[in-house]
Curated annotation (Swiss-Prot):
Secretion signal, residue range per the UniProt entry: none
PANTHER family: MATURASE K (PTHR34811:SF1)
GO CC annotation terms, alphabetical: chloroplast
Entry protein name: Maturase K
GO terms under biological process: mRNA processing; RNA splicing; tRNA processing
UniProt subcellular location: Plastid, Chloroplast
Record carries keyword Membrane: no
Source organism (scientific name): Thuja occidentalis
GO MF term (any one): RNA binding
Pfam families (UniProt xref): Intron_maturas2 (PF01348), MatK_N (PF01824)
Top-level taxon of origin: Eukaryota
Family to which this protein belongs: Belongs to the intron maturase 2 family. MatK subfamily.
Gene designation: matK
Function statement: Usually encoded in the trnK tRNA gene intron. Probably assists in splicing its own and other chloroplast group II introns.
Keywords of the record: Chloroplast, mRNA processing, Plastid, RNA-binding, tRNA processing
């Protein structure tokens, strides 16, 4: 790859005009085959056996089909009943997509610096918990929030139009169009979301398509919203018609008109906007009027309708007032509530006591939803009573203890910043008893016998890690009200992801 990039930099003008011959180089598909084999072998060991049947002869035949560009013939379809041959062709299709993606990634990275570094003022964070300190700082100063679910059902021709900004090679665009149609037709409408969004269905090609699509959305959408909510400030004296201006400003200014200084008036100076996205979920927090929020929702609908030719379902945009309702994001319930503060100021011999009211973001762990997820995984019943995990009784004692330990550690670290820590320790009690019942069921004994044999070894690792995590995060001088966010968490907790899917289904219905 390094040699390929060096050659591309030396012949950059040639690279922009002639990408098409690079798609037929077998060494790129060899790199893609090794990369795909490493990924599949680590997650699904059963595929290692089938991967030995990979043959570059199948890749050459597929390349010949692409060169013919006959749309009536499926490029990567197969009609063989043999499972080994069927898997071989499917594996060849994935390897070809990997090689195709390598060429596109390198070429687009060279032609667009913003594609790698991002736009000015944007931060791309690897940890999920880095989002919450930002939200704690910004959301209390906002009064509305728009929860947006980015639509994923996009037509292949729209993707081709997106890539036309970076690819100038016409044959490459035709080849890309052919592969995109073939790739989308291989999935049903229900499975397309899993392929693009979920981590299990992600391939290098699907990730590349999703990132390109989201980048295109944000590069056009966010500047438009910023321009809409942050127009140029205008002085009062610049308006020749004072009466006409006062009639207009009643619908724009948030504070009463009587308190405005007659010398200078700033138009929409207090409005600001903040944008956060993780996966397909986007949040737009703003400070403005209800009319502005409705206009923003209107422009979002028309943006996807006219620019991407998508019918944007109404449930995909939910506008909420932060002071009245709560919303869910990344497995948390989030709301903004007022927090009273008493400030004492002493000046000479006088003591002044002032009451201040500030807004505070409260992240809440969905304990009931976590209990429902644990009940579905057979750790407890619907009422929350712990039961034995029968499917794990064939494992060794160390494996059983390690699995329960990892479940609790992941939950504790993920929801360490929530305000309802008592509910988390209730979850811990359920997992502890479920672990003891699983061991008792395996050895055909009682919970008392298991606890006498193991003693303090039940969840020993989790207790030690928990104390270490708390002691390293808190000092004696810090307030106990201060929350802990773990910067090492890079993905959602599985239980939180399951709960978020249930929430999305309820919204759609």
């Amino acid at each position: 790859m390094d040699e390929f990039q060096r050659n591309s930099n030396x012949h950059r003008x040639w690279q922009q005009l002639f990408l098409y011959p690079l798609f037929f180089r077998e060494d790129l598909y060899a790199i893609a085959h090794d990369h795909h084999l490493d990924r599949s072998g680590s997650s699904e060991p059963t595929e290692i056996f089938f991967s030995h049947f990979f043959s570059f002869l199948t890749v050459k035949r597929s390349i010949r089909r692409i060169r013919k560009q006959n749309k009536s013939i499926s490029l990567f379809g197969n009609s063989d009943s043999n499972k080994l041959i069927e898997y071989n062709k499917n594996f060849s299709f994935k390897s070809m997509l990997e090689g195709f993606t390598i060429v596109l990634e390198v070429s687009i990275a060279m032609t667009s610096k913003h594609f790698i570094k991002g736009m000015d003022g944007w931060n791309s964070l690897r940890s999920i918990h880095c989002i919450f300190p930002f939200m704690e700082d910004k959301l209390p100063h906002s009064n509305y929030i728009s929860d947006i679910r980015v639509p994923y059902s996009i037509h292949p021709e729209i993707l081709v139009r997106i890539f036309r900004r970076w690819i100038r090679d016409v044959p490459s665009l035709h080849l890309l169009r052919l592969i995109l149609h073939e790739w989308k037709n291989s999935f049903s409408q229900e499975n397309l979301e899993k392929v693009l969004i979920t981590q299990r269905g992600n391939t290098r090609f699907s990730l590349f398509l999703w990132n390109s699509y989201v980048y295109e959305c944000e590069s056009f959408l966010i500047p438009l919203i910023k321009r809409f909510f942050n127009p140029q400030s205008l002085l009062y004296g610049s308006f020749p018609d004072r009466t006409h201006f006062e009639k207009k400003i009643k619908d724009i200014v948030i504070f009463p008109l009587q308190k405005i200084s007659p010398k200078x008036i700033w138009l929409l100076k207090d409005s600001f906007i903040h944008y956060v996205r993780y996966g397909e979920r986007s949040l737009i927090a703003l400070k403005g009027t209800h009319l502005q929020v409705k206009k923003c929702r209107y422009h979002l609908f028309h943006f996807w309708q006219y620019y991407f030719h998508l019918w944007f379902q109404p449930y995909r945009i939910c506008s909420l007032e932060l002071s009245k309702t709560s919303f869910s994001f990344l497995g948390f319930f989030l709301n903004v509530k007022m927090r009273p503060l008493v400030v004492r100021a002493k000046m000479l011999d006088d003591l002044f006591i002032t009451d201040l009211i500030t807004n505070e973001l409260n992240p809440i762990a969905p304990i009931r939803s976590i209990l429902f997820s644990l009940a579905k995984e057979k750790f407890c019943d619907i009422s929350g009573w712990p039961i034995s995990k029968l499917s794990w009784t064939s494992l060794s004692d160390d494996d059983i203890l390690d699995r329960f330990d990892r479940i609790w550690i992941n939950l504790f670290h993920y929801y360490s910043g929530s305000i309802n820590q008592d509910g988390l320790y209730h979850i811990k009690y359920i997992l502890l008893l479920s672990c003891a019942k699983t061991l008792a069921c395996k050895h055909k004994s009682t919970i008392r016998v298991v606890r006498e044999q193991l003693g303090s070894e039940l969840f020993t690792n989790s207790f030690s890690k928990e104390r270490e995590f708390i002691s390293s995060s808190f000092s004696k001088t810090r307030s106990q009200r201060e929350r802990i966010w773990n910067s090492e968490i890079s993905q959602r907790n599985p239980l939180x992801x399951f709960w978020q899917k249930m929430e999305n289904k309820q919204i759609e219905n």
